[in-house]
Amino acid sequence: MAASPPLPTSIDGGQVLDDMEVVEMKYLFGKVLMPSDVSWDTEQLVIPDEHVGKLLDMVVMNRPEGGFFVVVVEDGEVTGKLWLFRYWKRDDVHCLTKGWGCYAREKGLRAGDTVSFFHSTACGRFFICCRCTCMSFLSLPTTSHRIHGSSVLPQPRAAQEAHHPFSGHATLCLGNKASDHSAPARHATASLGCAAAQPPQVPPTPTPRRRRRSMMVHPEPPEHTTDGMPVILESMALVSTPPVAKRVRLFGVYIDVPPLRPGGEATQDFNP
């Protein structure tokens, strides 16, 4: 059977297409998936003890003679699609085994997502619906529940059912006429009896800008030099040193001969 076209924007007191069947469903139970529920090694959904009684109402015998017990549910998103899960019990542990792994892989379920079961009292059918969170954790603590992408402290059972995303009654619209383009039907979240709590939006933290260090090199002014002349860094006064006298030995006696001036006269000022 082909799926129905998408729902209109409003369901409660709003517009419903002519080719849709409105099904009133009663919420049975739900579970926040744990890593063991979506593991490819086990491929089983463990049912909590407080919901075992409601699960047994869904269990039917597949084969009367030596058969096994199964749970037949209808997909709440795809019209006319049935899922068959094998019921298995061991050491007071109730779980759904064969068929659950295919459902989890097709829906892309991960730890932290929610799966819920419904019952239609009018037609006697059972439905399964899932809600994938945007941020699913790989592991969740057993003392907390994940609702709308946020981890909260454990609450009393009545409070948990009141805040459950699928608690109370839900309205499901199914398509009756065949359609060329298959589109999954959607639930009317406005008729679930609770408003979807949006997590508080935290403003983004501004990232501090890194300051770039810039180094500017100022060229030194060129030195004014004259071709062929050395550069004088510091001027000093020139002091003339008196000439040194010559010492001559004559007949065993040393005689100091004073230096001569440019005019040929002997100098009186000299260093002996």
From Swiss-Prot:
Q: What organism is the protein native to?
A: Oryza sativa subsp. japonica (Rice)
Q: Taking the first listed entry, what is the main subcellular location of this protein, grouped into a coarse class?
A: nucleus
**InterPro entries, per database record:** B3_DNA-bd (IPR003340), DNA-bd_pseudobarrel_sf (IPR015300), LEC2-like (IPR044800)
Q: Which Pfam families match?
A: B3 (PF02362)
Q: From the UniProt record, which GO molecular function terms apply?
A: DNA binding; DNA-binding transcription factor activity
Taken from the UniProt entry, a GO cellular component term is:
nucleus
What are the subcellular locations of this protein?
Nucleus
Keyword annotations for this protein, in alphabetical order, are: DNA-binding, Nucleus, Transcription, Transcription regulation
Q: Which residues lie within the region annotated Disordered?
A: 189-227
DNA-binding segment(s): 30-134
Q: What's the protein called, per UniProt?
A: Putative B3 domain-containing protein Os02g0455900
